[in-house]
UniProtKB/Swiss-Prot annotation:
Residues 491-554 are annotated as: Disordered. Heterotrimer of A, B and C subunits. The lineage of its organism: Bacteria, Bacillati, Cyanobacteriota, Cyanophyceae, Gloeobacterales. GO terms for molecular function: asparaginyl-tRNA synthase (glutamine-hydrolyzing) activity; ATP binding; glutaminyl-tRNA synthase (glutamine-hydrolyzing) activity. Belongs to the GatB/GatE family. GatB subfamily. Allows the formation of correctly charged Asn-tRNA(Asn) or Gln-tRNA(Gln) through the transamidation of misacylated Asp-tRNA(Asn) or Glu-tRNA(Gln) in organisms which lack either or both of asparaginyl-tRNA or glutaminyl-tRNA synthetases. The reaction takes place in the presence of glutamine and ATP through an activated phospho-Asp-tRNA(Asn) or phospho-Glu-tRNA(Gln). Residues 502-540 have a biased composition (Low complexity). SUPFAM superfamilies: GatB/YqeY motif (SSF89095), Glutamine synthetase/guanido kinase (SSF55931). This is Aspartyl/glutamyl-tRNA(Asn/Gln) amidotransferase subunit B. PROSITE patterns: GATB (PS01234). The gene is gatB.
Length: 554
């Protein structure tokens, strides 16, 4: 009798994210203390944010505006029950001076939203948002002798961050992979940066992720035991934590171990999660309404006014760039990642430059300069007007792509008018056909062996001839005119010499063998699209190897 092995169980991850968005207000949520990052410890504090007896909190109106804008952008319903209130979340920790946190519990500011994400190679997916609520941040502990509490000799507390305004955005458990988790977090970051409600600087803690993950057999409806992962301060950390924790929990199930509901810490050094404490439940925090703050009530007219302030969000821009401007999904994604870059690109297009050409220039030459100098696009001297003028000079045939490439370093350093710089240096492109024909004739006359080889089948030598002409004109020749002239002249058959007297004894010699040509480097006029990232590069002066006398007559 034969036995059949049980089929191998396939597991899937069930993931939800809690994202803490630090709102870019000048002052804290309930007091007038500064929120500036990096100040001397314990200087941005007052009796209110340090929980001194007799003080009363006052809600920051700007923080409320930012929270409602964010909720509107995430398609949330603003306090569907008609009002929203604050609650005290009770817990004891050294960086929480009041021994409670002012947060929101049963009546959050907004609920039931969604965010659409795009993962390469997969259809767009909608991730549900359970709730968005406001709360104050805690202080910060600095552990001496180690980078965390374990192993430290003592801890110092900095209350500068205590009381800073936060929005906590809780997703539905709709995420299934590490790539989806990173896409969700990335899109959320883009939205809050577009709105101007958060700078999104993860290295400063402006955007922090808590990951909730469980595993279950694929297709099963019941959830597994949830584990929370903290200390995720980058998209890479988020992805690696998902991958590690998924594998760890699957290993536990396969080995018969029980998964414990707990909070774990992501350790960047060891690339694994470490158990911190058992996971708290809501009743552990003993929530009750905050007696010192009145409920928030917004009417429909006010909520509509917030929605009208949203403007075009990243997903809407990407769709417009693809459908209206004809850009690829990749180009649309790169250009809309930051609002300033998208606005720069749109200004270049508005000045008459074709969208594809502008996209290639911004995502190519401009982006390379930004990466090299670590500047934002608003800080560079090549303004949209300068970019449009430079690209227009190329399109008008006044300069070549090669000349444009040579001008860029000076323009990035000093700014100014590209047209004036061209005139000052005498770099106007030579497009006169008669003038270029004379130069082409000189080049071909000096390369008779290579001409013979070209006519014998080595047509890839065309790039070599183009390079020679470009060298003679210091890169100023119009590559298209040069290509046309060369192809025309090389196609002409040379004038046959007068016939020699016949000799019965002579036998015609076999034609010389011509070895295969090396691969030809692309030339500017053949392959470069006007204004493309590839086009704004110098053409090779001699793209193919010239033919020596021995090569031609071997």
């Amino acid at each position: 009798m034969t036995s059949t092995a049980p089929p191998k169980v396939q597991y899937e991850a069930v993931i939800g994210l809690e994202v803490h968005v630090q709102l870019s207000t000048e002052t804290k949520l309930f007091c007038r203390c500064s929120t500036r990052f990096g100040n001397t410890p314990n200087t941005n504090i007052c009796p209110i944010c340090t929980g001194q007896p007799g003080t009363l909190p006052v809600l920051n109106q700007q923080a409320l505006d930012y929270a409602v804008l964010t909720a509107s952008a995430l398609n949330c319903q603003i306090h569907p029950q008609g009002l929203s209130k604050f609650d005290r979340k009770q817990y004891f920790y050294p960086d929480l001076p009041k021994n409670y946190q002012i947060s929101q519990y049963d009546l959050p500011l907004a609920e039931r939203g969604w965010l659409e994400i795009e993962v390469e190679g997969e259809p767009a997916k909608r991730i549900g948002i359970t709730r968005l609520h406001m709360e104050e941040d805690a202080g910060k502990l600095v552990h001496a002798g180690a980078d965390r509490l374990s192993g430290s000799t003592h801890s110092l507390v900095d209350f500068n961050r205590a009381g800073v305004a936060l929005c906590e955005i809780v997703s539905e458990p709709d995420i299934r992979t590490a790539a989806e988790a990173a896409a969700y977090a990335g899109e959320l970051r883009r939205i809050v940066r577009y709105l101007g409600v958060c700078d999104g600087n993860m290295q400063e803690g402006s955007l922090r992720f808590d990951l909730n993950i469980s595993v279950r057999p694929a297709g099963e409806g019941k959830f597994g035991t949830k584990v929370e992962i903290k200390n995720l301060n980058s998209f890479n950390s988020l992805q690696r934590a998902v991958e590690y924790e998924f594998a760890r929990q699957v290993d536990c199930l396969l080995s018969g171990e029980r998964i414990v509901q707990e909070t774990r810490l992501w350790d960047e050094a060891t690339q694994r999660t470490i158990s911190m404490r058992s996971k708290e439940e809501a009743n552990d925090y003993r929530y009750f309404p905050e007696p010192d703050l009145v409920p928030i009530a917004l009417n429909g007219t006010q909520i509509d006014a917030y929605r009208q302030r949203l403007g075009e969000l990243p997903a809407q821009k990407r769709h417009r760039y693809r459908e209206t401007l004809g850009l690829s999904s990749y180009d649309a994604g790169v250009l809309t990642d930051e609002r300033e870059v998208a606005e720069y690109f749109e200004q270049v297009v508005a000045l008459g430059i074709p969208a594809k050409q502008a996209a290639n220039f911004v995502s190519g030459a401009v982006a390379a300069h930004l990466n090299e100098t670590r500047r934002s696009i608003s800080q560079i001297k090549v303004t949209p007007e300068v970019s449009a003028e430079l690209l227009a000079l190329i399109n008008q045939g006044i300069i070549s792509n090669r000349i444009a490439n040579e001008l860029l370093p000076d323009l990035f350093e000093k700014g100014g008018s590209p047209r004036a710089l061209v005139e000052e240096r005498g770099l106007t492109q030579i497009s006169d056909r008669g003038q270029l024909e004379q130069i082409v004739d000189e080049v071909l006359a000096g390369e008779s062996d290579s001409v013979a080889a070209y006519r014998g089948g080595r047509t890839k030598l065309l790039g070599f001839f183009v390079g020679k002409v470009m060298k003679k004109t210091a890169g100023r020749a119009d590559p298209q005119v040069v290509n046309d002239l060369l192809q025309s002249k090389l196609a002409e058959q040379p004038t046959a010499p007068p016939p020699e007297p016949e000799s019965a004894a002579e036998t015609p010699e076999a034609p010389p063998a011509v070895e295969d040509a090396p691969p030809e480097a692309p030339t500017e006029a053949i392959t470069a699209e006007a204004g493309s990232a590839e086009a704004i590069t110098a053409a090779s002066e001699e793209p193919d190897t010239p033919v020596s006398h021995q090569d031609a007559h071997a």
